[in-house]
Amino acid sequence: MAQKDITTVLSMTYKPGEKLMVDFAGDKLPYIDPETGETAKAEVFIGCMPYSDYIFACCVPSQRTEDFLFALRLCLEHLGGVPPIVVPDNLKAAVITPDKHEPGLNKALQDMGNHYGFTVLPCDPGEPTQKALVEDAVRITYNRIAAKLRGRDIVGLLALNKAVEEQNVMLNQTRMQKRPYTREERFHAMEKPQLKPLPEQVFEMRYYADL
């Protein structure tokens, strides 16, 4: 599905500020571990506000629950508010047992939802259109960022995230094809005013024996 087709479908399907779609990219980004000097690889978390196609990306060490929730927290802080619905693509850190009617959610993610005031609605495994839209948006974002960083020797995860942030800003501020606005302009005009305020207290993850 072409980028312009994805954007058109997303903006037609979703209400402003209603949903945040989140997933990890299928591929990782390399960086140099400052302690060992060896090449390490980071997981790339990507969040997308589908109405505006506004993107947030950051890197974390793994797809473990604590890293996923940390990335999600950074995403919400970047957005400056909370959408009522968060849609994970059946990540293991988010969804324990995928099911169309009653998916088994990770307890820590449920705790986070209660803290921030959002509902978790995983992608319907039987709805290929929604799943394809999320995966395509993630793939396109990753490819654009990875292409810009290719060949650079980036030392440390903090430096990698700084480089990713720079490319993320450029992506959101680039005029979209056949549209008179950028992702950033549309997000701030149409979506951010609809978001609920962030809670005063930062979410702290509770650990469960069965996580």
Model region roles, listed by residue range:
Residues 88, 99-100, 120-143, 160:
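RNase H-like two-metal-ion nuclease catalytic core shared by retroviral integrases
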Residues 81-101:
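Acidic/histidine-rich, metal-coordinating catalytic segments
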Residues 71, 108, 112, 133-141, ...:
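Alpha-helical scaffold elements adjacent to nucleotide-binding pockets in ATP/GTP-utilizing enzyme cores
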Residues 102-120:
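Two-metal-ion acidic nuclease core segments, chiefly of the RNase H-like superfamily
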Residues 138-211:
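Active-site-proximal acidic segments at structured loop/helix or strand boundaries
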Residues 1-55, 66-67, 204-211:
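Mobile-element integrase/transposase regions
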Residues 57-82:
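Active-site beta-loop-alpha junctions of metal-dependent nucleic acid enzymes
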